[in-house]
């Protein structure tokens, strides 16, 4: 298995743990407070943290499984919805459309970035 695929699976697992944990592991590590979520940049209409997380993970997934990119895109869209719906039943978490929009926007941005990279590489 290529190193990019191993990296993708490890980051995907870490992402799932952080996303499904009841509270913020990063908030606990940085602020000693499970209820405080670190904010990379201010939110606009969507959650910027979710955009960054899904964008980075999607880029790694698309690079790792380039020949199956359609399935990777479906996986991340499905994962976006399922993880956000799971927040309905996880203590100290809540379903928010702004988070869901941020998740999907991160996937879309990663697709755009990859397509630009491919286009510029063909010139």
Question: Which residues make up each language-model segment?
Answer:
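Bulky hydrophobic segments
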Residues: 1-98, 104, 108-123
């Amino acid at each position: 298995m290529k190193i990019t695929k191993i990296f993708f699976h490890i980051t995907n697992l870490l992402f799932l743990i952080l996303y499904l944990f009841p509270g913020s592991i990063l908030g606990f590590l940085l602020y000693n407070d499970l209820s405080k979520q670190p904010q990379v940049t201010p939110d606009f209409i969507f959650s910027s943290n979710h955009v960054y997380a899904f964008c980075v993970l999607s880029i790694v997934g698309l690079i790792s499984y380039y020949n199956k990119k359609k399935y990777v895109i479906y996986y991340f869209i499905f994962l976006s919805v399922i993880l956000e719906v799971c927040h309905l039943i996880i203590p100290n978490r809540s379903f928010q459309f702004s988070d869901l929009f941020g998740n999907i926007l991160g996937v879309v941005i990663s697709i755009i970035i990859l397509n630009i990279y491919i286009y510029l590489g063909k010139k």
